Amino acid sequence: MVLPLMICYRPIGIIHSPFKEPKDVPIQASAAKDIEGTVEVFPEFSEGLKDIEEFSHIILIYHFHRAKFKGLLVEPYMHEEKHGVFATRAPARPNPIGISVVRLVERKGNILRIRDVDILDGTPLLDIKPYVPEFDVRENVRIGWLEKNVHKLEKARDDGRFFSLNFNYIFPASLLEAPERAKL
């Protein structure tokens, strides 16, 4: 099988949070307890939200629009040794896709009010899935090098190693507009 050189996704919405700069963002949702935000789903995708309010938690899949890829070996947060990027949760990746499990507080039309947000304001949303513990939780897991460091999670914040200050170069603002208005 020959894989395509590029896969192109169109955002289905935008994630809004109180975090305007990467340095303020908790590095995982479990360290962002009770932080509120909203998900604005573009109107042409709002029909896909039918019945989402029946779930207490949802999985947000998004594009790390300000991440800067530096290579396949990274020094992750909470550790001073390099690891393969695929053995980390670092945002700077060959395909900068993020996932977060958040609490769904309420839905009003195409707006979802959420809690436990660890996402930068203005982040492009690629997809939403319901969180189902029977599907998503595994028992008897090993967490590798994180075993010695996971206790640092609650206080850990971005330190600038993975994010670009000039995100317009990486992700043009026009792509954050509703797809029918985007100037592609």
From Swiss-Prot:
S-adenosyl-L-methionine binds at P26, I27, Q28, H65, R66, R89, L120, D121, G122, T123. It comes from the Archaea. Residues 9-140 form the TsaA-like domain. Pfam families: TrmO_N. SUPFAM superfamilies: YaeB-like. PROSITE patterns: TSAA_1, TSAA_2. The keyword DNA repair does not apply. Keywords: S-adenosyl-L-methionine. InterPro entries: TrmO-like_N, UPF0066_cons_site, YaeB-like, YaeB-like_sf, YaeB_N_sf. PANTHER family: TRNA (ADENINE(37)-N6)-METHYLTRANSFERASE. Belongs to the tRNA methyltransferase O family. This is Probable S-adenosyl-L-methionine-binding protein PYRAB06630.
